[in-house]
């Protein structure tokens, strides 16, 4: 799976998706499913620390995944343009260097996001356990914590706060989405050109030999890798572009967007991020036979996988009588 640049970048994207989904899993279990737990406080200082790191980590990993998608589309575009075996764009070493540069750059750009918010105690409010809870004393009280905009972010007319929002909207969302649009169009054009070329190859005269027919059929296979990448890039565009627009609106109309828009659709934006992270795995399995093969080798026991391989080989031999006849004639 890792013998090409595209597969290496897909591996890096999968690492980001795993981290994003794992962080969201803990967040949903504690802050959503167990929010009404009467015997355990939800907004403690420790859990607010986790929530702060969850926000920073999810933004960092999700942005890294988006820029890796741009790198993947660019690498595939250059590979198709060069059209040479063992080109520089196809080497895993180049892909891993590119992934490391993206990881490091996004991490540096996400540093302001760590400085924007701070944990503060809610004055005048405290958490008290329910009367049915026997693990606490009768007059047990714990403080409630929440997020506040940090003092460093509010100085100089909220310069750091606005800079962070503009950076999220432009560098983390809009610019990679625009690049994905142009690269996706370029890949679609390449797919159409390859499809025209494939039709020319598969238009074999009726009096042609079996060897030439099989050769034309082999050369005329569609470029499934490029098609899979285009579908993945479209998913990124559908899920990320609306978030970029809302981030820019939030930078322009900060108070109004937070009060009247983001408060109501914040969960929808989080859902789009989760859909983007989860749908990639489905697309890999549906559109890549090599990915499916590797997935079954890892998940299924070896003796079960060997039986599946034998049945697959038998079905392939039964469905290709023409190939057998050609071999006997040779």
Tell where the protein language model's regions lie, with residue ranges.
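Seventh transmembrane helix
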Residues: 177-183, 227, 232-248, 264-318
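Helix-to-loop junction signature of class
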Residues: 19-39, 58, 62-66, 106-125, ...
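Class A (rhodopsin-like) GPCR signature focused on the TM5-ICL3 interface and adjacent 7TM helical core
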Residues: 68-82, 112-122, 168-205, 227-250, ...
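Class A GPCR helix-loop hinge within the 7TM core
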Residues: 60-100, 286-288
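Intracellular effector-coupling site of seven-transmembrane GPCRs
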Residues: 8-16, 98-100, 132-157, 185-243
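Extracellular TM2-ECL1-early TM3 structural module of rhodopsin-like
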Residues: 5-72, 86-87
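Non-transmembrane, juxtamembrane loop and terminal tail segments
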Residues: 199-214, 299-330
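Loop architecture of class A 7-transmembrane GPCRs
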Residues: 34-55, 60, 87-88, 108-174
